[in-house]
A protein has these predicted regions:
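Iron-sulfur cluster-binding electron-transfer modules in prokaryotic oxidoreductases
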Residues: 1-242
Length: 242
C-alpha cells in the first residue's frame, strides 16, 4: 500500500511552521510523498502568494497535485480535502493523519500534558467520521489530556468555526455535493462580520474548560476570532520542543 499526504493549502497558510514539521515527520519516518492540494490547478498562484516567507520556497517546490492510483491511500489533515476525495475519488482510500499515526507509528513520542482538562470540539465537516473522532480522542489520551465532551459532540455537532457563516465555495458544491449540498441544509448561512463574532462568542460559552482542542483549521479560525484559548491537535502532537 502506498500513502500520499496532502499538506492542505489552507492549513499550511494558517500553520506554516507546524505544517513543515508534519511534512518532515512523514518524509523522514515513512518516506511519504507530499503534495499541496486535493484539486488539480486550484488557486495555485493565490496560495503561493500568501504563504509565510519561512515556508514559501519549500511550498513552491512541493507538487501541487499528483493523480492518485487505486492502490494509494490519501492521508488527510483537512476535512475539506477529505470530503472532496470521498466523493470525487470514491475508489481512493482516505485516512486522517490521526488514524495513520495510531496505526503505523508504534514509536511515536507523545508529549505529556499533565492530565490537563480540555474540551474536544468536533467538526461538522466530518460529523459522521467515527473512526477519526475515536482516533483524536485516543491521541489526546496518550498525551495525558483529560477530554471533556460537549453536549453536541461527534455526529451531533453543527460547528465549523465561521466557515458556516458565509457561502460555501462553488468548488466544494461541485466536488462534494453530498456533504456540502445534500447534508448541508441550514448550513452556510451568510452573516456579517459582526454577527459572526457574536455567534462565535455565544458558542464558546458552552465550553466548560479554559482550553479547547479542535482538529480542523476552519474550527480554529473561528475560535481564534474571539480569542478563545485553543489548540489544533497537531500543535499538541508536534510542538516546537518536546
Amino acid at each position: 500500500m502506498k500513502y500520499r499526504y496532502i499538506a492542505s493549502c489552507v492549513f499550511t497558510r494558517d500553520y506554516p511552521e507546524l505544517s513543515l514539521r508534519i511534512q518532515d515527520y512523514l518524509k523522514e519516518r515513512f518516506g511519504m510523498e507530499i503534495i499541496r492540494c486535493c484539486a488539480e490547478k486550484y488557486k495555485v498562484r493565490q496560495f503561493e502568494e500568501v504563504m509565510a516567507p519561512s515556508v514559501c520556497e519549500q511550498w513552491k517546490a512541493t507538487p501541487h497535485y499528483i493523480p492518485f492510483e487505486p492502490n494509494t491511500t490519501m492521508i488527510s489533515i483537512c476535512h475539506n480535502c477529505t470530503a472532496v476525495f470521498q466523493e470525487s475519488h470514491p475508489d481512493i482510500n482516505v485516512l486522517s493523519l490521526w488514524e495513520f499515526i495510531l496505526q503505523h507509528d508504534a514509536d511515536f513520542h507523545y508529549p505529556d500534558y499533565g492530565c490537563e482538562r480540555m474540551t474536544i470540539q468536533d467538526c461538522w465537516r466530518q460529523y459522521d467520521n467515527q473512526a477519526e473522532q475515536a482516533a483524536v480522542r485516543e491521541l489526546l489520551r496518550r498525551m495525558n489530556i483529560e477530554v471533556v465532551e460537549m453536549a453536541e459532540n461527534r455526529e451531533h455537532t453543527r460547528f465549523c468555526g465561521t466557515s458556516l457563516y458565509r457561502p460555501a465555495p462553488p468548488r466544494n458544491l461541485k466536488m462534494a455535493p453530498k456533504r456540502f449540498v445534500e447534508d448541508a441544509e441550514g448550513m452556510f448561512v451568510t452573516h456579517t462580520e459582526e454577527e459572526q463574532k457574536q455567534l462565535m462568542e455565544e458558542h464558546c460559552q458552552q465550553y466548560q474548560t479554559k482550553k479547547v482542542v479542535a482538529y480542523c483549521h476552519y474550527c480554529t479560525e473561528g475560535l481564534r476570532l474571539v480569542g478563545q484559548p485553543h489548540y489544533h491537535i497537531a500543535e499538541l502532537l508536534f510542538p516546537y520542543s518536546v
